[in-house]
């Protein structure tokens, strides 16, 4: 793979060609209690990604900068990830099942410039010293020391953008509880994310009418590249 790429080119093409197709359907749970559900078509996905892109553009971030995502797998989480990918910014995910010390170390090692996520998580930022020096935004509200990311959205939905990058450009960094010693993030490039998608597609043989219910949240990225529906 030698030409410039972006994992989002495949996804955004579906936003234009099949805007009415269901992209994501995610139940909202509080413990074992069902609190409702979120659904999103590909057309809505493109519009909301464009809004998040407009907000990210106001944070003075440069291509290659890292953004720490502190949120559960929700529709806003996936929209944020796609907005970051498409602008050449790098989402950083941290396994919240790790010990407090390892979470501290992972945040430091991430070299993130900004933290964006849910109010329910970010409102506890003061308990995590590595977050003290980061800009903090929540995509679902605000709290003391946490700004409302939605206030940065453009008044009119802008055009959806997608920056083409070298295949070796950083795509996604994840810190998990499986590592030992000093936390080391698994670094997936845009090229490797695309190759992973193509490998899964060759093995799985998806069809246009598929509705998939993956157990592994990152597989949602593959499903979106295929243009199929995901129910979590």
Give the location of each predicted region.
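Conserved AMP-binding A3 loop
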Residues: 39-43, 171-198, 229
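ANL superfamily adenylate-forming
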Residues: 30-34, 120-167
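Conserved pre-ATP/AMP-binding loop-to-beta segment of ANL
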Residues: 19-22, 154-175, 182, 187, ...
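Conserved AMP-binding/adenylation subdomain of ANL enzymes
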Residues: 90, 194-211, 216-232
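Short hydrophobic alpha-helices that are characteristic scaffold elements of the AMP-binding
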Residues: 52, 82-87, 109, 224-225, ...
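ATP-dependent adenylate-forming carboxylate-activation enzymes
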Residues: 71-72, 92-105, 119-121, 230-232
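Conserved AMP-binding/adenylate-forming core of the ANL superfamily
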Residues: 3, 20-62, 69-74, 78-82, ...
């Amino acid at each position: 793979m030698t030409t410039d790429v972006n994992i989002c080119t495949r996804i955004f093409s579906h936003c234009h060609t099949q805007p009415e197709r269901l992209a994501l359907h995610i139940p909202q749970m509080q413990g074992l209690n069902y609190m409702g559900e979120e659904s999103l078509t590909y057309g809505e996905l493109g519009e909301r990604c464009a809004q998040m892109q407009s907000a990210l553009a106001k944070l003075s971030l440069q291509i290659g900068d890292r953004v720490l995502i502190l949120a559960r797998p929700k529709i806003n989480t996936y929209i944020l990830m796609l907005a970051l990918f498409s602008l050449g910014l790098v989402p950083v995910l941290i396994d919240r099942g790790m010990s407090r010390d390892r979470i501290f170390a992972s945040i430091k090692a991430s070299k993130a410039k900004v933290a964006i996520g849910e109010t329910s998580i970010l409102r506890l930022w003061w308990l995590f010293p590595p977050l003290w020096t980061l800009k903090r935004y929540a995509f679902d509200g605000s709290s003391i020391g946490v700004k409302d990311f939605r206030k940065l959205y453009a008044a009119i939905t802008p055009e959806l953008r997608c920056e083409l990058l070298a295949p070796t450009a950083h795509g996604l960094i994840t810190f998990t509880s499986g590592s030992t010693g000093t936390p080391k993030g698994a670094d997936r490039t845009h090229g490797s994310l695309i190759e992973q998608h193509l490998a899964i597609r060759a093995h799985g043989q998806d069809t246009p009418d598929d509705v998939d219910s993956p157990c592994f949240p990152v597989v949602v990225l593959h499903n979106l590249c295929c243009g199929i529906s995901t129910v979590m």
